[in-house]
Amino acid sequence: MVFSISRRAALRLAFGGLAAAADFRPRKLFARDTSGDGDKVRVGAIRWDAWYAPDMAPGSSEWHAAHGLDPAKYHHRAPFFAEKIGTDRMFISGTQASMDAEISYAAKAGISYWAFGWYQFGRPLRKGWEYYQLSEHNALVNWCALIGLGSLAGNFPPTADLVRYFQYENYEKFGDRPLLYVMHDKSPLPAAARALDALRAACAAAGVGNPYVIAQSSVAKLGALDARGIGADAIGAYASAPAMTGGPIPYATLDAFVRKFWLEMAATGLPVVPNAMTGWDRRPRIERPPPFDPLHLNPDDYVIPGTPKDIAAHIEAAVAFVRAHRGTCEANNVLVYSWNECDEGGSVLCPTWSENGVDHSRLDAVARVLKQAQLL
């Protein structure tokens, strides 16, 4: 695949040079022509960019995530641009070249867009998005924002910023409607509903398409309550997995659970954007709990990683579900967990580090099934 870089070459590239928040603008781009996509199901993947300069913020979420992969047994979960600097130490600090390579990998595999977990300017968690917008290749993979219910209610990002982002040529849309994922939290629904009403009004005033908002929850009925409570357009999930209290479970159990979850979401009567799960092995966070993570699981509570073929078949099933439920899955869309949740879920689509070079076996398997599925 093009733009592939060595780990050492990536480390030689200097970090920095991004514009300040007030002046930041994306590189001028030309949108990828999707007019010939026809009946193709759009496949997105979630990004959580803890891998771009985490050591700039010691003690932060991104710092904990990156150093959670320090033990040798977790090195294989690190993104491909990581550098092994000790038996139990990785240096992970993505660069513009890293992002260019990620875009190329994703585009060649048939990934339509990334859903970026949203963070404020100045956080390393925001650097991945900034590098993406500065890339000469960012028209190859679209993007959209993924925010929390409380963020929506708290006007973060500000309404004016969202309206501006929605006008980016590479912002993912359903027709002319920009996608916006809103993840469940315990925030009051009325405030979020008012904020969403204001966002829709601001979009209308600016001549921007009415946002297509997907309320995300790992419980179908709760997602439906959120969607109806704030006036969202559809439901989906950031991640969903069975309760684990008796030791590791096979990936096949996760696969079956998620397929059942799609039906549960459809049974609410609301439109659905089905999720797909590449894995749910949280052992790095279980063994070295970061302060931001509310889950307190036992070390044996994890999903045994699936093979590349297993993961590809699961994503293929999500695409097939959309095709078989066109009325319910009106946005013609699937969202995959995840592209790069390397410490939380593992088995990510983003190519990863290995002693023998870049491991893109999972992404290659997914590319093969997506190519075949989109030809049907």
Predicted features along the sequence, with ranges:
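N-terminal export signals
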Residues: 2-4, 9-29
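Glycan-processing catalytic domains of CAZymes
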Residues: 33-376
